[in-house]
């Protein structure tokens, strides 16, 4: 698993949006944002290695990207925080985003 993470971190382009959408439609990617905006954890369950790779590629691409949000700038991506877990059903990627005061 660590090899996969290191490989994906070397990829500098975003996953094609249509690929992500197809994976979601097929149920290969499901995600559950933490409803508590103070913590900002999002868990992505990936049922295939392809889905896992697409999630990591996209998160890596989005790291450092900013968008305005209620007087704050929301920073998406890893911020050095990524956990992976493998169980009988899926690979789970837990990513973190935070808020930076404008």
Predicted segments, located by residue:
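Mixed-charge, Lys/Arg-enriched low-complexity segments
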Residues: 9-10, 95-101
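Acidic, low-complexity, intrinsically disordered interaction modules
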Residues: 30-96
């Amino acid at each position: 698993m660590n090899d996969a993470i290191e490989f994906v971190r070397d990829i500098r382009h975003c996953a094609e949006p249509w690929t992500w959408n197809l994976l979601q439609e097929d149920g290969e990617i499901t995600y559950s944002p933490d409803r508590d905006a103070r913590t900002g954890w999002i868990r992505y369950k990936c049922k295939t290695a392809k889905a896992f790779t697409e999630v990591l590629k996209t998160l890596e691409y989005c790291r450092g990207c900013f968008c305005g949000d209620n007087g704050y700038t929301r920073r998406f991506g890893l911020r050095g925080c990524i956990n992976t877990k493998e169980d009988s059903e899926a690979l789970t990627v837990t990513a973190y985003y935070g808020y930076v005061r404008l």
